[in-house]
A protein has these predicted regions:
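N-terminal hydrophobic alpha-helix used for membrane targeting or insertion
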Residues: 14, 24-25
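Bacterial N-terminal signal peptides that target proteins for export
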Residues: 2-12
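C-terminal motif of bacterial Sec signal peptides marking the signal peptidase cleavage site
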Residues: 20-22
Length: 320
C-alpha cells in the first residue's frame, strides 16, 4: 500500500475539498464484503455485515506514551447505516474523550466506508484509503496523518492489519510515531471481533493482537498476533491473553481486566501487560449487566525468539 508522507495542515485546503467528494455516500459504490476464508466472510453475502475501522497513533518517549485512538463502527439496518466514531487523546496517564458521535446515513452498498461528520473530517486517497483524520472544534485541533506502510497482514476472518508511519499535529506541535489501522467485519450484525491490543517497543518492534470473539461467550477468545520486528515480520495464528488481575467497574456492574499474560500456541511468544491508566464507559441497556468499553494504557514485556521487548501501548476491551 503506497501512501504519501505526512503533510502539514496548511496543505489541506485542496485535499479537504476532494475529501468531501471522495467520502460522499451518494456516489456509485462497489459492494464491500469481508474477505478471506473465515466464517464471517462466508456469511457476508447472505447477511448484512457490521464493520470496524480502528486507527491508533502511538509515540513512545522514555517511560511515557502519547496515544490517539480513533474507533469507528458501522452497522447496516433496513432503513440505513448506523455509524459511530469515537476519539481519545491520552498522555501522561490522562485521557481526554474529545469526540463521540452516533448518526444514521442512507442505505449504502459500501457501509464500511468511513465518513466525515460534524467536527470529524477525513483525507481520503483513491480507493477510499484514509490518509488523514482531522478534528477541529473552535480553537481545538488535532490532525493525524498516515504515511508509508511499514507492515501489512490479513487474517482468516477478513481482518486487515496495517502498521504505518504517521504524525500527530496539535496546533503547531508535531509528534512523529506509528499508526495502527485495524479493520474487521462480521456477518449478521454481530460484533466483528473481541478485544485487541497494540503495543510497541519504541521504533524497534510493534505488536498487534486481536481476538476472534468477546469474553464471556460460549467459547474462549483466541487471538491472532502480528509483529513488526527489527529484521522480520511475524505472525501467530493462536495467542492467548489471559486475565491475571481484574478491577470492578460499578457503572456497568462488571469486572474488567487489569493485567494480562500472553502466550502463543507454539511457545514462541510470551509476555505480560499491566494497565497503568484507563478510560472506561458504560453503555445503555436493560441490565443487570451493561455494555462496557474500556481503553487501557499498558506497559509490560513481550518475549519472542528474536529477543525481549519492553513495551508500552493500548488494550481495548469491550462487552456489548
Amino acid at each position: 500500500m503506497n501512501r504519501p508522507s505526512p503533510r502539514r495542515p496548511g496543505t489541506l485546503a485542496v485535499a479537504l475539498a476532494a475529501m468531501v467528494i471522495g467520502c460522499s455516500d451518494s456516489q456509485p459504490e462497489a459492494p464491500a464484503e469481508p474477505t478471506g476464508n473465515g466464517s464471517a466472510a462466508e456469511g457476508a453475502g447472505a447477511e448484512t455485515p457490521a464493520f470496524e475501522q480502528n486507527f491508533v497513533f502511538a509515540s513512545v518517549s522514555g517511560d511515557s506514551v502519547f496515544l490517539v485512538p480513533w474507533l469507528t463502527r458501522t452497522t447496516s439496518r433496513p432503513d440505513g447505516v448506523l455509524r459511530e466514531a469515537h476519539g481519545w487523546l491520552a498522555r501522561s496517564g490522562t485521557w481526554d474523550a474529545f469526540y463521540s458521535e452516533k448518526w444514521m446515513t442512507a442505505p449504502s452498498r459500501a457501509p464500511a466506508r468511513v465518513l466525515p461528520h460534524g467536527n470529524l473530517q477525513l483525507l481520503v486517497q483513491e480507493g477510499d484509503i484514509v490518509d488523514g483524520i482531522i478534528f477541529e472544534d473552535g480553537t481545538r485541533s488535532l490532525e493525524l496523518t498516515l504515511g508509508e506502510s511499514r507492515a501489512s497482514w490479513g487474517g482468516p476472518r477478513g481482518e486487515t492489519v496495517d502498521l504505518l508511519t504517521g504524525a500527530a499535529f496539535l496546533g503547531d506541535d508535531r509528534v512523529d510515531g506509528v499508526v495502527l489501522h485495524l479493520a474487521r467485519a462480521s456477518a449478521g450484525g454481530g460484533a466483528p471481533g473481541g478485544d485487541w491490543a497494540f503495543v510497541m517497543s519504541g521504533d524497534s518492534a510493534q505488536f498487534v493482537f486481536a481476538a476472534d470473539v468477546e469474553y464471556g461467550g460460549e467459547a474462549e477468545p483466541v487471538y491472532r498476533g502480528w509483529a513488526a520486528l527489527p529484521d522480520r515480520g511475524r505472525q501467530w495464528p493462536e495467542v492467548h491473553l489471559d486475565w491475571t488481575a481484574t478491577q470492578a467497574f460499578p457503572p456497568a456492574r462488571r469486572d474488567v481486566p487489569a493485567s494480562w499474560r500472553l502466550r502463543s500456541g507454539d511457545a514462541s511468544l510470551d509476555g505480560e501487560l499491566h494497565a497503568i491508566s484507563s478510560e472506561m464507559q458504560a453503555g445503555e441497556g436493560t441490565g443487570p449487566l451493561l455494555p462496557v468499553r474500556a481503553l487501557f494504557e499498558v506497559v509490560g514485556e513481550v518475549s519472542t525468539v528474536e529477543g525481549d521487548f519492553a513495551v508500552h501501548g493500548l488494550v481495548v476491551h469491550e462487552r456489548r
